[in-house]
Amino acid sequence: MATVTVGTARVHYDIEGAGAGPALLLVHGTGAGGAVLTWGQVGPRFAGDRRVITLDLSGADRTVDDGGPLSVEMLAAQVIAVIEDAGTGPVDLLGFSMGAPVSAAVAALRPDLVERLVLVAGWAYTDGDEYMRNLFTLWQRLGGSDPEGFGRSVTMTGFSRGFLNGIGREGVEALVPNLPPTPGTLRHVALDLAVDIRALLPRITARTLVVGGTQDITVPVENSRELHAAIAGSAYAEIDAGHVMFFEKEDEFVKTVTGFLGS
């Protein structure tokens, strides 16, 4: 584990693998669990022939800062600092959910640091999308008054109906406590409500793959299609799964990403 200081934040990150190719940096989504909770299962599958970097953004468990409001640009600065501190050269950059707009901002602001870009279940803006605005507002309300309700809402929207029915009641009940509404998670939710990277998207020059989940009811797939349309020359793929598609369809997700990164 390594750390780098960015403003008031001491950002924790890990490097796994020893491959000679471009490193792959994975940027997590909303949640205080950060890198461990998001990438613990699928991350090692990318480490066979490359180095894989995971980090905890402000609001996640291992990174400590002043607890103030977050912005896309602030978190992008943390990703940039990790790339530079790790000394791996330009990286392939993959962002999931909240991590997708953050990763897109990194690619737009520092094109010299990004070889290829993968945006998974991401979106360009929240204000104007009444579905997502209301969902994130609901999470804020539940986070302040009903932690179990928060966990159930996140579980219900994070996975497809078929997946939830497939794992059954015991499996679903085990998922509910996995994303508690900690202060850090609620800082992420506040950021989710404020996302607007539309002005940055035309500046992205890295080869880009956008991946949407056809059954995503956290960030509906239309948002991924809009990202693809806004990034010149980007490739696009859909996986028939809910928001956390790498949990529901791990093999297909890994094949989709490695197929793009190896091309």
Give each language-model segment a name.
Residues 241-254:
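Catalytic histidine-centered segment of alpha/beta-hydrolase-like enzymes
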Residues 104, 108, 115-144, 184:
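Flexible "cap/lid" loop of the alpha/beta hydrolase fold
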